[in-house]
Amino acid sequence: MAKIIGIDLGTTNSCVAVMEGDKPKVIENSEGHRTTPSIVAFTDDNEILVGQSAKRQSVTNPEKTLFAIKRLIGRRFDDPIVQKDIKMVPYKIMKADNGDAWVRVKDQDKAPPQISAEVLRKMKKTAEDYLGEEVKEAVITVPAYFNDSQRQATKDAGRIAGLEVKRIINEPTAAALAYGMDKKRGDSVIAVYDLGGGTFDISIIEIAEVDGEHQFEVLATNGDTFLGGEDFDLALIEYLASEFKKDTGIDLHNDPLALQRLKEAAEKAKIELSSAQQTDVNLPYITADASGPKHLNIKLTRAKLESLVEKLVERTIEPCKTALKDAGLTVSQINEVILVGGQTRMPLVQKTVEEFFGKEPRKDVNPDEAVAVGAAIQAAVLSGEVKDILLLDVTPLSLGIETMGGVMTKLIEKNTTIPTKATQVFSTADDNQTAVTVHVLQGEREQASANKSLGRFDLRDIPPAPRGVPQIEVTFDIDANGILNVSAKDKATGKAQSIVIKASSGLSEEEVAAMVKDAQSHAEEDKKFKEMAELRNQADSLIHSCEKSMKDLADELSEDEKRGIETAISELKEAVQGTDKARIEDKLKVLTDASAKMAERIYAKKSSEGQAAQGQTQSQESTKPAEEGVVDAEFEEVKEEDKK
């Protein structure tokens, strides 16, 4: 049976895992790393680089190297958070026709799910190389606090990458699965504090033994989808840029190349300061002015970094308080605290979490891999490989519709266990009203306009009647992925209208289909590119070995043989310069045949010479006296009873 893989699609890094028997296995990528940078680059010769190779060339190609795209997924261009990001990244973020935030690369506009799909394709390929078979299905994780449009966009990314997304699960829940899978059975309440590259989540999860099943029930979740390691980097970049401006008067924000170098240096310094007290940020030739080149050299202490990011760390505490309140628990009722996400390696974060929860966080969970491992466990549950685990997740935000006076009426409260269904009856606001618009909202505010609009649809042909008489039944249905279906029905006529909520923006079916096609054509191009590279390598290797053999065996070859092989070599060299695969294969065969004949003839010649020499040696041996070279051995008989 084909495997379902688990993918942690992260803001900064991504990771893929699979269940092998009863143990989850994190799969190493082609570079031998267990995590892959979530970076996609477009080169001038139309190659798409993903992961480490994209990261390596980011300094020389800043405007076409896309990182932290997850921060834009499912977001509107006018979102203040997106506007803040525009000023901080070297690539171009623009407004799509549907109002979403897209990116522009080489005069082409691309949707964030398209870029994320490239990362997912790399994860898919990593798993396929390891498993030795095609992978078609995956469980993909998202931040618990992702709204409906962000979940839809993540699902779209999976489809574009050629994956059927069997389930979208929340990152903290996945981490809890990874933690609780092999722990002793019994009831406990854990807090999963997940501070990743771009998002923060806190989930309170109860692990219990119910009828022989290991049950993971999310009691409450909260978070901030625009708070993570990237923000810590940005705070440090701002500080370094302002210090440099003080010294030189030059603003590095206007130079994409300098900004990219600054980002790399900030990330490196932040990581170093998790274990060291001080580091140097040293960037020679960062920029230049009329007076010559300028260098950036700033000493940075851990204390300084902590003062720069203190407010960011503090921002994580309020969601923790809310999650505990929603779960109806106090800090003392939490048995274990688990840290997930690379940013939790920062000592200040660990100290803050310990102070808030009053206990030291667990150190036996790998913050970079736990989420992918949990996704792989959930994948195995769905495929039937793992049988005694039940996962009960929740919807992170309340869902409802806009009613008279611009008020949001909630049908499903936040932290409701999913899947779930809720129905409520509404009526018309005016006499003889023949149509109603159902405006679907997500959020916690009373005022409808202050919440996230998920979409709207009309229910028409309602028989005219006084206001308040018609009965319109609205049903909200959330599936296990946290994705919403809404339907409305006029109880008098039985007329119904329903939609799967696609954010008022989002990608249409046609756009997704076009992107799937585009990704498939790229996959075909990549395959051809790889085949050509392998063929050229094969040709170069054969040319090298033939030239070496001709040099070593110059005296053994006839003039005709030399001429034939030299011609075959030069024709293959010429073919390799071109792009005609069939011609390279043809010339490769000619040289292979010629070199094989040469090797065969020389081997036969050497073999007959060797046999003649051996025959001569044997005849000399037989004339020697028999005693020579013979040694008498003394044997002692061992009786059976002596053996015992």
Curated annotation (Swiss-Prot):
Compositional bias per record (Acidic residues), positions renumbered to this chain = 629-644
Question: Where is the region Disordered?
Answer: 605-644
Q: Annotated Gene Ontology MF terms? A: ATP binding; ATP-dependent protein folding chaperone; unfolded protein binding
- Which residues are recorded with the post-translational modification Phosphothreonine? T199
Keyword annotations from UniProtKB, A to Z: ATP-binding, Chaperone, Nucleotide-binding, Phosphoprotein, Stress response
Q: Where is the composition biased (Polar residues)?
A: 609-623
For this protein, the record's Gene3D superfamilies field holds: 1.20.1270.10, 3.30.420.40, Actin, Chain A, domain 4, Substrate Binding Domain Of DNAk, Chain A, domain 1
Please report what switches on or represses expression of this protein: By stress conditions e.g. heat shock.
**Is the RNA-binding keyword given for this protein?**
no
Give any Pfam family that matches: HSP70
| Protein role | Acts as a chaperone.
Q: Which HAMAP family match?
A: DnaK (MF_00332)
State the family named in the UniProt similarity comment for this chain: Belongs to the heat shock protein 70 family.
This chain belongs to the protein called: Chaperone protein DnaK
Q: Which gene encodes it?
A: dnaK
